[in-house]
Each structure stands twice: as C-alpha cells, then as structure tokens.
Curated annotation (Swiss-Prot):
Belongs to the TRAFAC class translation factor GTPase superfamily. Classic translation factor GTPase family. EF-G/EF-2 subfamily. The lineage of its organism: Archaea, Methanobacteriati, Methanobacteriota, Methanomada group, Methanococci. The keyword Secreted does not apply. It is found in: Cytoplasm. Catalyzes the GTP-dependent ribosomal translocation step during translation elongation. During this step, the ribosome changes from the pre-translocational (PRE) to the post-translocational (POST) state as the newly formed A-site-bound peptidyl-tRNA and P-site-bound deacylated tRNA move to the P and E sites, respectively. Catalyzes the coordinated movement of the two tRNA molecules, the mRNA and conformational changes in the ribosome. InterPro entries: EF-G-like_DII (IPR053905), EFG_II (IPR041095), EFG_III/V (IPR035647), EFG_V-like (IPR000640), G_TR_CS (IPR031157), P-loop_NTPase (IPR027417), Ribosomal_Su5_D2-typ_SF (IPR020568), Ribsml_uS5_D2-typ_fold_subgr (IPR014721). Pfam families: EF-G_D2, EFG_C, EFG_III, EFG_IV, GTP_EFTU. One of its GO terms (molecular function) is GTP binding. This is Elongation factor 2. One of its GO terms (cellular component) is ribonucleoprotein complex. The keyword GTP-binding applies. GTP binds at residues 28-35, 94-98, 148-151. Keywords: Cytoplasm, Elongation factor, GTP-binding, Nucleotide-binding, Protein biosynthesis. The gene is fusA.
C-alpha cells in the first residue's frame, strides 16, 4: 500500500472518532502570513503522519505537491497530526484577508469550530483582524492567537527581550479587548487568549519556527535564545528545535473544540428550529446515525468535475449515490461523488459522517450557505443565512465582445453568483448589459479578468465602475392614498424612518424576512421587540425586505388577509427604486393605516393591488424628506512620520474625515472615513504620496448621507446615466 493510500485509510478511520477531529481555520488581516502558515503546517505534517513515512518520504511527498504548484489558499485540507500519543484529523481552511473577499471568510466560519487568528508582530492588530475576529465570534468559533513575523522585530526593529515581551503583551491585550467586546456572553472570559496556558504562540511562518510559553518551559528555549538565533541567522536551527507545525497544531488540538463539544453551543446559534425535535437533538449531539443535516460553505469549480460543494455535516451521513434535498432552492439532488480534500486534490471515500468537512459533486443548484438534508426528512427551517459584514458597493456593466459567447457568459455569471453570494448579477433590461456588483475594485477585477476572462475564455468589454447608492427618509409623510388602476381599491399609508436600533439589528443579521412571510412568528416578534420596536407593532409586521418594513395598523378589514401576498409584493416593488434616483431604499417603515377593497375578488387581483401599493409606497417615501446615501470605507494608513502630512492630504482631497491618529515609534497610524466614490485610484496615489513607504487597508463601514450641497449634482448624474428624466 502506497503512502497516499495509507494516509487516506488513516483519515477514514479518524473521521469516525469525533473527539479526535478538529475543524479549524486560519484567518487574518491581508499579508499577515495566513497562506505561508497554512503551507508550512501542511509541509510540516508531511500531509501524512511521520510514523508512516519517516522524514525522507514526507519530504518527497511535499516536493511532489510543490511541483504541482499546490496552494491551499481559501481551500480545504485534511491532514493528520500526532499529539500526546494520539493521532488527530485536522480539517484546515485558509481564508483570504483582503477586504474585497470578506464573503469567503464568512462562509468558511460556518464550516469550522476553531480559528487560528494570525497577527503580524510589526503591524499589530489591524482592521481586518477585528473583522475576521467579529465574524468568528458571531458564528461561535473559538479563537487562538499566532503572532507572526517575530524575526522582523529582532532583525529590523532590534528589540530587546523585554521590548519583545512588551510588544507581545500589547497585541495580546488588544486581541483580548476585542474578544471581551464581541464574544458570546458565556465565553467572554473562557475564550480570552492566555499566554501562560498556551493559547498564544509566537514565531515566523516564513522561517518555519514557533514557540509558546508551555513549549518554552518544556524545551528550555528563552526569548534571549530566540533573539540570538535570529541575529546569528540560525533560524533553520531554531526551526529544528521548535518546529512551526508542532507548536501551532499542538496548541490547536489542546485548545480548540472537537465537533462533539462545539455543536452543543453552535447549533442553537445557526439553526432556529425546534431544539427538542429528533433532528435538533441529533445535530447538537453530532450523531452520525441521525437524520442528515449539513451546510454548503463554498462552491469550487473544477474543469472536469464541474461544481464541487464543500459541505460541513452536523448530523447523519452521506454516501455516494444518496438522494439529497436542497432546502433553499427546494430542489432534489444526488451525491454523485463523496470525497475528502487532500491538498489540491480530492480523494473519493465511501461515506462521510457528522462532524466532518467533505466535497460533494452533483449538487448543481447549490449555492454557498445552502442547507443539505434528506428528501425523506426535510430540515425546516434551513440554517440561518450567512450574513456578511460588507455589501456590494461597486457595479460594472459587462458585454461579451463576441455575441456567440453570450450563452456561455450567462452560464459563467450564474456560476459566479452561486459560488460567491456577495456578488450581485443583474441584467439591464433596456440595454441588455449584465451588471455585476462586488465589494470593491479588486473583487470586480478578479471576476472580470480571472473568472470570466482567464477561466471562462470569454473576452468582455467592461464599463466604468459605478458606485452603488441608497435612498432613505429623514421625516414622516402625511397619510397617502394608493389607488388601484380600476379605482375600486384604495390603501392608505404613512412612511416614517425605521427605528435606528431595529435597522441596526437587521444589518447585524438578527432579523430575517423568513420570520414574517406568512404570519409573524413568536421568535420573529421577540427579536423585533428586543431590537426596540413597540410590542403592538411587532405583532403586525407583514414583511421585512432589504432593510425596510411594512406594518399593518388596520383593524377588522376582512379582505386584507386575502390580499396580504399582493400587498407585500407591491411594498417590495415600491422600495426597490427610490424617488430621487431609482436607487434601493433602506431604513423605511411603511404603516398601512386603512384600506377599502372591491367586494368582488375579480376586481382586486394582482394587476390592481400591486400597483396601488407600489405607487402609494413611492409617493409616501417621496413626501418624507428623501435623501441620498453613499457607501463609506474606513481607511487605515500606516506611514513613516515624514510622510504623515502627505497621507492626510490624500484623505482630505477625497472628502475624507480624519477620525484618529496614533504615533508608534517612527510610524504614524491615520484612521479615517472616505466615500467609496472618491476612492478610485487611491492605491497608486497613496503609494506615490509616500514613495511606497506606507501600508494601508480599507473596510466597508456602511452608508452615510450625501452632503446637502452635493446631492443635486449626484442625483442628476445617476438619473442621466439611467436615462431617467430630470427632476
């Protein structure tokens, strides 16, 4: 039996031993060393256990993988590591750190139970560190900390052992402050990163060494020894004495939970069904013999196998050929192949049980976040939808250069939308152009150049990037009458701003449209009251859509129940295009005050009720002091003090606002807020202004009101672009 086959057998055995499984991710700010760490953990584990292969074979195996150009970035890898005389199966997910790819991070968090948060020793805690930590804690994923690039503190900043420890303590304190602020109540203390018990490791992923306090006590290596090894350029020797993979994986096995432990508290957080039902209990217990329940966390497109769904199973088992049911798309599917991820390849296995991460082919209609179950035992409701910390803020129009490529382009766009639910794809009915909305310039570039151009082989014309605006209201409208085209049905409504706390709860993913579709559920009502809506109104919410809500304040109107679905559809159509520039409306509450309907049902059908509500909503919004909102980004610049003035000038020239400034040694950290519309070309400009000496990053920070003096000009530009008549 070859070493690969032995490894697969080892993984198959461990998959059934839940307390010896760790589903973990690596996440960090961009360029803090995630992928280097992932690659070296993989190399260190030899992708096979040491006792099976010996060092020589492990190296051969790794070189063979390297020759294939393996990069496990944003991919899933199963590997085996020995700790305390036992072997453990580690399912590792590496996540991207660039702000434009935050969606990948969110999806990965649903699959894992623990995360190694990587933080650069030189830069410290950065915006994306906070973002990925927030996403992890929201999904009840337990963190441990790896402080990377320690060699740079020694060789570049020449820190003494005392200064080194001081820098570590500062980073740990900042991370713990974030954990205390954002962790679930029951874990605020338990999940803090404690150096003494080994929840923190320090090292250099690039030079393949790491250390933790328990490892220092065991091995006798001190901070002074580490400085000596680095200064004398003997990091190779240090890597032999304190191998990166051993220290980081030991820490992960000791401190991160197995699926049996994690699912007890994670399932109630991501599934809102009946905890006492058979499937509810089975998921909490991670029962491999219970009803099937899993969630698709990523769609990977393979030229030969087609769409591959990476799936985390919480209950039951999937075998090749099993019939499956996709709850979100309400479709049946068949598991054509069931595999595990082994580096860049997939290895077929007969079945996968609860607590594991697997690769499934055959789920053609699946999207990231889809709930998978058995057609004979449908999981209702499905898992909570994945909520992202950012949303698409830039749109481009694309057209195939060659019209014969159009069907292929449509298929690729459908595939991209399934793979990445932070991308919006729409067709402009008037021009026939495809509109793609993404998280930023880089996100759009990757879609158009890489996914459509390189992978799809289609040449496209890409339009100028357009910023996505929103509309909202600042006042309350008078009572407005919405009249049906036949004049026999009248609905009376008021538009007013939604309570800020309720809108914030919606943005944070605490309110879901599903809870209000047929009739407000008790859970839905409780969430609204908790968010700050009056109890009397919470019972009467008819729909929540795109951050807007409609509340039925009428009494005793018999036909209203029959017309409910039509009223909701009219409301949705009414808030899709605001009165100023036909941009989406957000933060608006429509109160339905009264209604009169024709007694004959034939005269109150969809063609009558939907337009009546749509026109009423639009009219009410237009009379409630509508304003335009623009997307904002937090911009962080880390620059030598000599260039601080240039950095600030660059922000001020872009309608930016300086929020805070800090000095750290000879570096200045500028924290600011800048409109997305002013950020085009920022990368080149800031590099030029600071002669390439600065580090910078951005993060979506929500929508803000456009300054009053600029609103007419921007509204006119949008209306002209859309071919709408001037106001």
């Amino acid at each position: 039996m070859g070493r690969r086959a032995k490894m697969v057998e080892k993984v198959k055995t461990l998959m059934e031993t839940h307390d010896q499984i760790r589903n973990m991710g690596i996440c960090a700010h961009i360029d803090h060393g995630k992928t280097t760490l992932s690659d070296n953990l993989l190399a260190g584990a030899g992708m096979i256990s040491k006792e099976l292969a010996g060092d020589q074979l492990a190296l051969d195996f790794d070189e063979e993988e390297a020759a294939r150009g393996i990069t496990i970035y944003a991919a899933n890898v199963s590997m085996v590591h020995e700790y305390g005389g036992k072997e453990y199966l580690i399912n590792l997910i590496d996540t991207p750190g660039h702000v434009d790819f935050g969606g990948d991070v969110t999806r990965a968090m649903r699959a894992i139970d623990g995360a190694v948060v990587v933080c650069c020793a030189v830069e410290g805690v950065m915006p994306q560190t906070e973002t990925v930590l927030r996403q992890a804690l929201k999904e009840k994923v337990k963190p441990v900390l790896f402080i990377n690039k320690v060699d740079r503190l020694i060789n570049e900043l020449k820190l003494t052992p005392e200064e080194l420890q001081g820098r570590f303590m500062k980073i740990i304190a900042e991370v713990n402050k974030l954990i205390e602020k954002m962790a679930p109540e029951e874990f605020k203390t338990e999940w803090l990163c404690d150096v003494a018990n080994g929840k923190v490791a320090f090292g250099s992923a690039y030079n393949n060494w790491a250390i933790s306090v328990p490892y220092m006590q065991r091995s006798g290596i001190s901070f002074k020894d580490i400085i000596d090894y680095c200064e004398q350029e003997k990091q190779g020797e240090l890597a032999d004495k304190a191998p990166l993979h051993e220290v980081v994986l030991d820490m992960s096995i000791k401190h991160l939970p197995n699926p049996l432990q994690a699912q007890k508290y994670r399932i109630p957080n991501i599934w809102k069904g009946d905890a006492e039902s058979a499937i509810g209990k089975s998921m909490v217990e991670c029962n491999p013999n219970g009803p099937l329940a899993g969630v698709v966390t990523k769609i990977i497109v393979d030229k030969h196998a087609g769409a591959i769904s990476a799936c985390r199973l919480f209950s039951g088992r999937i075998k090749q050929g099993d019939d499956l049911y996709l709850v979100g798309s309400k479709q049946k599917a068949r598991a054509q192949q069931v595999s595990i991820f082994m580096g860049a390849e997939r290895v077929q296995v007969p079945s996968i049980s609860a607590g594991n991460i697997c690769a499934l082919t055959g789920l053609r209609e699946a999207t990231a976040g889809e709930t998978v179950c058995s057609p004979s035992e449908i999981l209702e409701p499905g898992f909570e939808s994945l909520s992202h910390t950012s949303e698409p803020v830039i749109t481009v129009a694309i057209e195939a250069k060659n019209t014969k490529d159009l069907p292929k382009l449509i298929e690729i766009l459908r595939q991209i939308a399934r793979e990445d639910n932070t991308v919006r794809v729409e067709i402009n009915e008037e021009t026939g152009e495809h509109l793609i909305s993404g998280m930023g310039e880089l996100h759009i570039e990757v879609i158009t150049n890489t996914k459509i151009g390189r992978d799809g082989g289609i040449e496209v014309d890409v339009g100028e990037p357009i910023v996505v605006y929103r509309e909202t209201i600042m006042g309350t409208s008078p009572e407005i009458e919405g009249k049906s085209p036949n004049k026999h049905n009248k609905l009376y409504m008021i538009a007013e701003p939604m309570e800020e706390s309720v809108y914030a709860a919606y943005v944070e993913g605490k309110l879901h449209d599903e809870d209000y579709k047929k009739k407000t559920t008790a859970d839905g009502e409780a969430r609204l009251v908790e968010a700050g809506l009056e109890k009397d109104q919470a019972k009467k919410v008819m729909s929540i859509y795109n951050g807007n809500m409609i509340v039925n304040m009428t009494r005793g109107i018999v036909q209203l129940d029959e017309a409910r679905e039509l009223i909701i559809e009219g409301f949705k159509e009414g808030v899709r295009n605001g009165p100023l520039a036909a941009e989406k409306v957000q933060g608006v509450k429509i109160k339905l005050m009264d209604a009169t309907f024709h007694e004959d049902a034939i005269h109150r059908g969809p063609a009558q009720i939907i337009p009546a509500v749509r026109f009423g909503v639009r009219d009410a919004v237009s009379q409630a002091k509508p304003v335009l909102l623009e997307p904002m980004q937090s911009v962080y610049i880390n620059t030598p003090q000599d260039y601080m003035g240039d950095g600030m000038k660059e922000i001020n020239n872009r309608r930016g606002q300086i929020l805070d400034m800090e000095q750290e040694g000879d570096m200045s950290i500028i924290k600011s807020s800048v409109p997305v519309a002013e950020m085009f070309g920022f990368a080149g400009a800031i590099r030029g202004a600071t002669q390439g000496r600065c580090l910078w990053s951005v993060e979506f920070s929500g929508f803000e009101k456009v300054p009053g003096e600029l609103q007419p000009k921007i509204v006119k530009q949008i209306r002209d672009r859309k071919g709408l008549k001037s106001e």
